[in-house]
Design a protein with these regions (language model features):
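Bacterial N-terminal signal peptides that target proteins for export
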Residues: 1-5
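Lipid interaction determinants
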Residues: 6, 15-85, 89-152
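Repetitive helical segments and hydrophobic/amphipathic motifs
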Residues: 11-12
Length: 152
């Protein structure tokens, strides 16, 4: 009886060790609704800015990130230099980020002002797989990739 109990406990321990974190691709493919990607406050990394790759656009110190939490109507992240937060409103395919505040570190050469100006416009968004596109007047102005949390 003791051996059976020990065997069952060992099996239970092994089953409980299974990783619950999926890749960003699994996260994206498991979503029932595009807006659910915002409900869970997933982190997005900037991959292009105004038609240029993020690093070519001047984000050489740190890759900017964006987190949108629809449940709390909040946005936040990092501009490539400073951490920021603000209010986020998602209506249909429209995203508005407003009342942005940030830390005030100095970082030479980072196009942070332009990043904040673009982010604070009312933008249309689309999500294609793991890529979030923010557009203004039909032009893609920023693209973000769903950050793979398991890679850290």
């Amino acid at each position: 009886m003791k051996k059976l109990f020990v065997a069952l406990m060992a099996v239970a321990a092994l089953v409980s060790c299974k990783s619950t974190q999926g890749t960003s691709q699994e996260k994206a493919s498991n979503k029932q609704n595009i807006s659910e990607l915002f409900v869970e406050a997933n982190q997005w990394e900037l991959i292009s800015f105004n038609g240029q790759a993020a690093k070519e656009a001047g984000f050489t110190l740190k890759t900017p990130t964006l987190v949108i939490n629809m449940a709390e109507n909040k946005a936040g992240g990092n501009s490539g230099c400073n951490s920021f937060g603000g209010e986020a409103i998602v209506e249909g395919s429209t995203l508005t980020i407003d009342k942005v505040f940030s830390t005030k570190m100095y970082c030479d050469g980072v196009p942070e002002i332009e990043f904040f100006q673009m982010l604070q416009q009312t933008l249309n968004y689309t999500i294609k797989g793991e890529v979030l596109q923010l557009t203004k007047d039909g032009q893609v102005i920023m693209e973000f990739k769903l950050k793979d949390e398991s890679a850290e």
